[in-house]
Design a protein with these regions (language model features):
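Glycine-rich phosphate-binding "P-loop"
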Residues: 1-13, 129-138, 191-200
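Conserved beta-strand hairpin/beta-sheet module of binuclear metal-dependent hydrolase folds
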Residues: 1-52, 144-160
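Pepsin/retropepsin-fold aspartyl endopeptidases
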Residues: 18, 73, 78, 89-98, ...
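Short active-site oxyanion
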Residues: 31-34, 64-65, 88-90, 156-157, ...
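Active-site metal-binding motif and surrounding structural segment of the metallo-beta-lactamase
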Residues: 43-92, 178-189
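Membrane metalloprotein/metal-transporter helix-bundle signature
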Residues: 63, 74, 91-105, 183-186, ...
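Cap/insert and terminal regions of metallo-dependent hydrolase folds
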Residues: 71, 146-157, 162-252
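Metallo-beta-lactamase
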Residues: 93-145, 232, 242-264
């Protein structure tokens, strides 16, 4: 499948993209892992998975499910790497995928269970749920999923791939539709899609200011958030968890390759 994608790419060697491993500890002390998106370039993601041990986790069945947040190339085209190590893994996608996107999963060699998540809330396990936002996105993509986690004695932690639905809607949806510890929005992680190309518009300042009402205690950002946005978060006094920038990230304001964020700290 990657050979087809590579042939049709303008820049097939682009190593940009987004993928993260989510580890959730239950009330009984058991850890469940989900792989959240899978990046863009096959070779780069295979290298990263090997470096971080994701390849062995996939092969050994230590990752319970693969969550594909949306159909964009920088989150999805390296899926053949996932299928290479875990062709039977349970995958979750929005039910808005186009036929071509669905064919890519099959062409990659996936033969496991496949859940197509409808609009709204989809419980994954106690205290953890996906939410599918039906929103139009650039490049003929429609629909994106995010993850909400209710952390005991702490509050809500939200994880997003690109947040094309908008960061304010992302936060407001949780507040209106979910119940969580202390009625507290504790943490946020992922690509926040405010100014991904750093073409800052003064109206984006309203989005930065708008986050203040949630009194977040831990924020981790990267990918499409935008370098200017990340710096504005820092300047505004938000509790941004810094990365190491040891694998080509342009700033420590981003959590990059191999970096870790924990909720609570």
């Amino acid at each position: 499948a990657w050979a087809i994608a590579k042939e049709n790419c303008v820049h097939a060697d682009n190593a940009g993209g987004y993928s993260c491993l989510v580890e959730i500890e239950s009330m009984e002390g058991e850890t469940t892992r989900y792989l959240f998106d899978t990046g863009w370039n096959y070779d780069w993601m295979d290298t990263c998975f090997k470096r971080e041990g994701i390849d062995n986790m996939l092969a050994n069945g230590e990752i319970a499910g693969f969550i594909q947040t949306h159909e964009h190339m920088d989150h999805y085209w390296a899926f053949p790497v996932v299928a290479k190590y875990a062709p039977n893994i349970h995958i979750y996608t929005p039910n808005t995928f186009y036929p071509e996107g669905k064919d890519y999963i099959k062409a990659a060699g996936h033969v496991g269970e496949w859940t197509e998540v409808k609009k709204g809330l989809y419980p994954l396990q106690p205290g953890v749920a996906l939410y599918q936002f039906e929103c139009p996105i650039i490049f003929r993509v429609f629909g994106e999923m995010s993850l909400y986690c209710n952390v005991k004695d702490v509050g809500l932690v939200s994880i997003t791939g690109c947040c094309h639905q908008g960061i304010i809607l992302f936060a407001d949806t949780a507040y209106k539709e979910l119940k969580y510890e202390k009625d507290k929005f504790y943490g946020l992680y992922g690509g926040l899609h405010i100014s991904p190309f750093d073409d800052w518009d003064p109206k984006y300042d309203d989005l930065v200011i708008g986050l203040k009402k949630w009194n977040l205690e831990r924020v981790g950002c990267n990918h499409c958030t935008g370098l200017i946005t990340a710096q504005k978060f820092v300047d505004a006094g938000y509790p941004v968890v810094k990365g190491t920038a040891r694998f080509r990230s342009k700033t420590t304001n981003y959590l990059g390759n191999g970096d870790v964020i924990k909720f609570p700290a």
